[in-house]
Amino acid sequence: MARFSSISDTLESDDSGIKVLFAVDGCAVSFSLALLTGQIPSTNSVYVIGYWDPSDRFSSIPFLDGDPNTNERISTTVCNLEDVPSPLRVEFCLLNQMASGMGGADLKLRTRAIFVCRFTSWSEMNAIANSIIYGTPIQAGVLQATISETETFMLHDEFNLALHVFLNGLSLKGRNKKDVCMSLNHNYISSVSENFPRGKRGLTGLYLQHEQKVTAAYRRIYGGSTTTAFWYVSKFGPDEKSLVLALRYYLLQAQEEVTGIATGYDLQAIKDICKTYAVSVNPNPTGFLAADLTSFSRLSRFCCLSYYSKGSVAIAFPSYVERRIMADIAEVDALREYIERDRPSLKISDLEFVKYIYLAYFECYNREQLKRHLKDVTVSLPDEDIYKKSSLGKCAVENFFTHVRSRLNVNDHIAHNVLPEQVEMGNKLVRKFGRARMYLSTTMTNESHFTGICECASVILKRLDTLEMKLQKYGWPSDRVDGSNLMADNQNNSTLIPYDKSRSSGMILECSNTHSRGGPMIVKRLLALVSADSRAGGIGPANMLMGIDSAIDGPLPVYRVGMSKGRQAFTVLMTECWERTIPSPGSAKAHLIKLNNSYGTSTEDLISRDLFLTSEIEQLIGSTVELPEITCGSADEQQYINRNEVFNGNLAIGNIVLDVDIHLRNPIPLRLMHAAIRGFRSGILRALALLLPKANIDHGSYPCYFYKSSCKKSRVMGGAPWMLHDAELAPDYSMFENAEFDLEMGIDDPLLIDQIDESLTRWSSESSRSVDLDPDKPCGCHDKIGLRVCIPVPSPYLLVGSKTLAGLSRIIQQAVLLERNFVETIGPYLKNYEIIDSGVYGHGRSLRLPFFGKIDENGIVSRRLVPFFVIPDDCADMEKFIVAHFEPKNFHFHSSIPLEKAAIILKDIGGEYAGFFERKITVNRDIFFGTRLSLSIALRERGVDINDCAAITTFVTDHILDDIITYVYEHIPDHAIEYQNLSVSCCVVKSDWILLQLIPNKTIGYRHGFTCVRFKHARARRASARSYLALNVDAHGRLCVCVIQQCFAAKCGNNKLRTLFTVDIDSKCRLEHQ
């Protein structure tokens, strides 16, 4: 038998040879061990399932088709091997314990060579060539004759030696593996290793003595002992292209590629890439279908005879995989580049930025975009170029990023995204409207005495019940709670309020008959009374409320007073002695005269002037009207320590009051803070000038009044761990109103801030009140700077409605974040870009007044709001501007303003200025996933009208409540007694969800609420949690009810809503119907 070269010569060759994945009828591992030890019969057959020849040695051999009429015929023609180099090195491989289609660069190789053959003679090379090209089985005798023992046992000698050492130790020590491991010391291993013969002799000895153990050990590193033809078809098929190309590439080529681009891609990814490799080939000569591949013999012939396994189609596929992956990555990198480029300039909150990223990827990778991309990267020729053929990134820019970038310029942002809705009514009509819908002027001027009422919640509640009963004979609604919000949209749709994502989570829309009299909605019932029209002579409900005989010719303010221990009181006044808390404007003017213009009037250093005046006036306030350090008095006393104006959606707005919280990474130096707030003012005025084009706003002189929470100067008394909720938390449902209800996420109350560890802020004696005016000294606010910003509504405009003010605050925030003087100055110190709270403008929400402090759970007073001067550059009368900070009419929402030129009412601000990402997500969701079934339709199908709160309550009581109680008894038995004899009260009704409160049975002792299900708390808060039912439709169109709980404890998330469990109502209703 002729030989072309010796084995020793070929060992020095760099030729990697051909890799063959083979199979046998039976266990491939047992077959291989028998072959390596010379125990295999020569008649056994080996089948080639797939192969990879980097040198493409058989490309010059003509392919001979089988007879299409007989699937069993295979060509036995001797191949022309003149162009095939000799000797031919072939690695026979098995699966490397690949249990699934999971890939990864850090995983072991997917196939592993188990023996190596060198084919040298014509007959040997013809046998392997026929097996590779035509799928002809190769006989075991040929493999025995051609096996390269030197190369083969280089693969196994170390493993065989380890087996020998272990099995020898096992025979000495028995089957106690622990003892075996302990006995394998260095000397023992060395002595045993020296006597072990390498190569075929060593493996044969092991195999003959320990056949089962050796076979089991090899099966641990080689797969193929249990794989079948069906396994290959199901894993890599079922179509021919995927079965041939994906099998070869995934098992034999991917991890050997020099670039390694596709190494980490799993099998499904490779199969998906096969689908866009649309190169046409002739049908498989065997004519087999996937269902016919029931044996390795047929599978081998099917794969080897396939036109996908040879020629340019097979050679070009690995290159196409790399090019396709590079094309995909290029589009993704382009998207990532745009996002990284936008991030520094797109000043939005972290939550909104996360939505922005998700939406950006969705815009690029939705169904239509993916179809277009896959069409662009599909090839019909093996070497077709796909570089930059995809338009994925370009479409993303056109469809999404261009719109987003319009937010980066305040002029374009307002011009393209904001649609103010206004009505020009003429001065005469607007003046009458303003006088009827703004506070009496006497309420905002200082008087010698207080006229009004200030009582705790329980007393106010009794007063309201009695008064409303008397007013029924005058036409007052018998079940009226808050009165219809006259300025709110949808006022004629008292119950069904369409959800508007431009509203903040704190804004309020409420059904008209949510609660009967005696319910907890104290605030809104007061607002309805004080804003009701009077009869002739100025006598109306407000007179009866306060017991005043004199005429009241206009609305009155309502205040909420926070008290210690979580209590609260409510104030309605007609006259007030404001000097009990606010220094008189005269004292401020006198102090400025005393300074004798030492602060200067030049504009050379505006920041130093502002800093000096802020410090001096703060000292004046502390020495003139000092708040107590701790309070525990009556409501009459505590109303001069803490007072919160309640926003009345029925009234017109005279001042734009912004609640600003600037969350900090680190304390900011005083000079930088004053410079940043000056930029903040510029952003406000720029936004107002664009929104209100007919207003004459002079940027150099228009007044903006700033008030800042006093710094934390000491830690005299920290908050106790049992502080569970803010003293300013109103006991109504305003925190749930007008919020998109997310069953997986908590809803934070905007008032729950700085509730733990509040420190005292005191002004000490005059001698110790000297202030360090070092401009580089950091502000004492380490975590947050709290500001109250008040801007008079410019003439000729008048604003109405909470929605208008909330929208205006969002636009101002966007404008401020686009103001370079603000962002570049304070940007390094900002923790996030959510700085203006737009949730404080809901009907019934309250906001603390300047000059008043906060009262925490223990009655400690802190965080007093004091003037923070930002004097306009062209201020004509600086003294007048400073004194104006002390006038109550300048920092109330509904205080009257000059109406001589008022002629336009701004009643709404629409457009996509806010909630752009949410709106876009909703539109895309409806397009690609279908419109979700609305709650109103789901209830209508069950005979319930969403506009009828009584019907909703009856439906829940009759069909749902029993299931809830049963579930609690089964799964939460420790709390079951609390849920006996429950009643339900409808709290919030919206188009997409309904919130109902579970009211416990007071006869069993749970008067204040339920116990927390999630945690056990201290005795004082053991029964302070609230439980609710949330009725909504899930993503699958099923009507569901969620049982949620709100606990005020810090470990429960401080007032966040937590879902306890969900009940599917549809299934129960269907059973009852049947």
Swiss-Prot record:
Its EC number is 2.7.7.-. InterPro entries: HSV_PRIM (IPR033685). A zinc finger (CHC2-type) spans 1012-1052. It is found in: Host nucleus. Keywords: DNA replication, Host nucleus, Metal-binding, Transferase, Zinc, Zinc-finger. One of its GO terms (cellular component) is host cell nucleus. The record marks 659, 661 as: Essential for primase activity. GO terms for molecular function: DNA-directed RNA polymerase activity; zinc ion binding. It comes from the Viruses. The keyword Cytoplasm does not apply. One of its GO terms (biological process) is DNA replication. Essential component of the helicase/primase complex. Unwinds the DNA at the replication forks and generates single-stranded DNA for both leading and lagging strand synthesis. The primase initiates primer synthesis and thereby produces large amount of short RNA primers on the lagging strand that the polymerase elongates using dNTPs. Belongs to the herpesviridae DNA primase family. Associates with the helicase and the primase-associated factor to form the helicase-primase factor. This is DNA primase.
